[in-house]
């Protein structure tokens, strides 16, 4: 038998997850459906956060390459792109897991899949048996 919710938010990006958490805090039985497979939307998963992480690491690399000019000798500075990408992935994972933690803490039910309206009272989750 399908679960019943007071409200279901389709989309777990910055607008969706904040909305779902707040609705649950206000006492509504809340679900959130996200198709990406991890919460946070484009910004957190493939946009703003990963880009800023890589920009920050690149800036540090550039600074380190110029340390000698100000009297700091460190030897050869090399870029390890694999480690930079792992660091970026770690930053994204920490933040997406943080949103999942907030869902658990605030009792928001999280469904992975693509949500769409079946009718005015039912939502189908593609890739799931849940309605």
Whereabouts are the PLM-identified features?
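Beta1/beta-strand and adjacent pyrophosphate-binding region of the FAD-binding site
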Residues: 1-13
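Glycine-rich flavin
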Residues: 2-5, 21-28, 34-131
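The conserved SAM/SAH-binding core of class I Rossmann-like methyltransferase domains
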Residues: 10, 33-34
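N-terminal Rossmann-fold NAD(P) dinucleotide-binding loop
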Residues: 16-17
